[in-house]
Amino acid sequence: MSGGAAGPAGPTDAAGEVVGAWLPASLAATGPLSGSGRTLRLLVPGLREAAAGQHVDVRLTADDGYQAVRSYSLSDVRASAGGAGRVPEIELAVERLDDGEVSPYLVDAMEVGDPIEVRGPIGGWFRWPPTRFEPGSAVQAVMPDPLGAAPVDAAPVQLIAGGSGVAPLVSMLRVRGALAEGPEFRLLHSVRDPASRWFADELDGYAAAGVAEVTTFFTRAAPEGGGRASGRLTERELLDAALPAERHPVVYVCGTNGFVARVAEWLVAAGHDPTRVRTERFGGL
């Protein structure tokens, strides 16, 4: 498959933003991720600046004209604005699915210089810094800031990821890490084993530099001396490690359908404001 010609403007996303036209892009660089993952750095002329947490649609076109479209989270948006003669650049993090239609090509076959099409960025809700709505606006009337809470764009940030769901949260950490100062960040990452931990060295670096507190829970195999046996993340463990509800954090949860549903339920039951629990999910339990 290859990238085809740009198509008509797309629909609006869930936040009412225009998704935009299909844009021709090309692979500029790639790198391995733990397990069966790969990062893809794409050059996308004409792309509008992306926010951390957003995603894009990608489209592949076969020689017979058949097209396949999939959505992938952005793991790096820092160069998405382009400017000063630079072409806008984004990074995707893609996990290879054995029965997938698009991911095997992206992970195993796509080479530097190969074309692809991109539409987006998409997502007005799952993004950091979050959009701040002015007092008296229609959105604030429906979803006011919790009593005594800092404005949403100044609130502490809790990131919670299951497996490859860490990708859009890494984009948030990269933006936060580039700031001289900013709100407190914490990341909780539930992952099968150390070998499946995406961006491990970078995340450990953020923890060492004080950018974020990082806690990892291994579900299948834990490292020796880690202090916790392997096993599924429990409600008690999550609530003990996460920022407490009384601090009114903005919480971003990304993972499989089942993981996100469980975590969101635990958070709301513990008193977290539902308007500050923001979720992104993909197939699976």
Task: For the regions a language model picked out, list residue spans one by one.
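Low-complexity, intrinsically disordered tandem-repeat tracts enriched in small/polar residues
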Residues: M1-A15
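Ferredoxin-reductase
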Residues: P11-I122, R132-F133, V191-D193, F218-R220
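Reductase modules of NAD(P)H-dependent flavoproteins
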Residues: V18-L23, P183-L285
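Short, conserved phosphate/pyrophosphate- and ester-handling motifs at nucleotide-, phospho-/glycolipid
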Residues: G53, G165, T256
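Short, compositionally biased
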Residues: V69-G83, P129-I160
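Active-site-adjacent beta-strand anchor residues
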Residues: L159-G162, V253-C254
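Histidine-anchored nucleotide/phosphate-binding helix
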Residues: V166-A178
